[in-house]
A protein has these predicted regions:
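Residues lining hydrophobic/aromatic ligand-binding pockets adjacent to catalytic sites
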Residues: 1-151
Length: 151
């Protein structure tokens, strides 16, 4: 495995979100929210899983990789290992709710745990390329270790 994508669902309509996934040829989505719920009903876990499956994209929720609760280190490590396992077979994106991976401050900082917590752990497991999909579909890459983070 050399590449993993990240995305935040934000306020997208499902059709727009699906278009972003298809644009990047995503085959599997790993939900890295602590709880697979959203005020946007299309992003509630069971609904999202069904919508993705109907469009040929796999889905798995790994709450132990969420940023809202502090998981046991061994649970978090197991979750990250599971992401790498899935990504070794399928083009994979990890998803949380935050649409922008970086803040808009003068000195950008991690805006979500995909950048501040998960990306460094994925890189430590040999993932060489992490591509963050922006709300407009543009891919960006950066060295997450240089970005200030609260995670």
């Amino acid at each position: 495995v050399s590449t993993i994508y990240t995305i935040g669902h934000g306020r997208h309509a499902f059709a727009d979100f699906l278009e972003l996934l298809q644009q990047h040829e995503i085959e599997f989505l790993v939900d890295v929210r602590s709880v697979a719920r959203s005020r946007w009903p299309q992003f509630n876990g069971l609904v999202l899983a069904e919508l993705l499956r109907d469009n040929g994209i796999g889905y798995e929720h790994l709450p132990e990789t969420g940023g809202k609760t502090k998981p046991k280190p061994e649970d978090l490590a197991h979750g990250v290992d599971r992401i790498v396992e899935i990504a070794s077979e399928l083009r994979t994106v990890i998803m949380c709710s935050e649409s922008q991976p970086l803040s808009q401050h003068k000195v950008p900082r991690a805006n979500c745990h995909r950048v501040g917590m998960l990306a460094p752990m994925l890189r430590a497991r040999g993932i060489g390329q992490i591509i963050h999909i922006l709300p407009n579909g543009a891919p960006i890459e950066f060295d997450e270790s240089t970005v200030p983070s609260i995670w």
